[in-house]
């Protein structure tokens, strides 16, 4: 049975010319020859650069980031290595009064103290932080000559004086 042909007037495109085995082999040899000569010459790394006069230029163009500037001892030494410490960013020193005011107005400290007064237990980190801040407040108050104990004693004395007046019937 014959296959039906397409439309009578339609022509097929001509087939592309297929290369013979010899032509393919010749092209492969040409590609290989070009590829073979595309690299650096043998021993180019050991021999250095091809231009002998360019060594002075190479030293000028050398990247300054490469290599260490500090000498490194290669043997075992008894002296410890002294490292240069980078200065930490200096915090502005506050006067004791300013630091005390800052600590007394600290919102986090106030919130944690309110939680303690309400009967809540703080975790270890929060408790440690609160203790450190309260200790610092005590130190600053001693430096400034202030103390809570004096205020409490004065209040107790005033209460006793008030009671004595009431008992004696005085105004």
Curated annotation (Swiss-Prot):
InterPro entries assigned: YihI (IPR007336)
Keywords, sorted A to Z: GTPase activation, Ribosome biogenesis
GO molecular function: GTPase activator activity
Biased composition (Low complexity): 40-59
Residue spans of biased composition, Acidic residues class: 148-160
Presence of the UniProt keyword Isomerase in the record: no
Any GO BP annotation: ribosome biogenesis
Ranges for region Disordered: 1-99, 145-171
Biased composition (Basic and acidic residues): 20-30
NCBIfam families, alphabetized: PRK05244.1-1
Function: A GTPase-activating protein (GAP) that modifies Der/EngA GTPase function. May play a role in ribosome biogenesis.
Subunit structure: Interacts with Der.
Family: Belongs to the YihI family.
Name of the featured protein: Der GTPase-activating protein YihI
Source organism: Enterobacter sp. (strain 638)
């Amino acid at each position: 049975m014959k296959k039906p042909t397409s439309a009578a007037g339609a022509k097929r495109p001509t087939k592309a010319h297929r290369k013979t085995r010899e032509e393919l082999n010749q092209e492969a040899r040409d590609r290989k020859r070009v590829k073979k000569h595309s690299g650096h010459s043998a021993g180019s790394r050991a021999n250095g650069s091809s231009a002998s006069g360019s060594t002075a230029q190479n030293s000028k163009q050398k990247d300054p980031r490469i290599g260490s500037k500090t000498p490194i001892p290669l043997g075992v030494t008894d002296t410890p290595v002294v490292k240069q410490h980078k200065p930490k960013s200096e915090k502005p020193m506050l006067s004791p009064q300013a630091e005390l005011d800052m600590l007394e107005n600290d919102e986090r400290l106030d919130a944690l103290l309110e939680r303690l007064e309400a009967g809540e237990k703080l975790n270890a980190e929060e408790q440690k932080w609160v203790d450190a801040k309260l200790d610092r407040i005590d130190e600053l108050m001693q430096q400034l000559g202030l103390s809570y104990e004096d205020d409490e004693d004065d209040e107790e004395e005033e209460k006793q004086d008030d009671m004595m007046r009431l008992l004696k019937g005085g105004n």
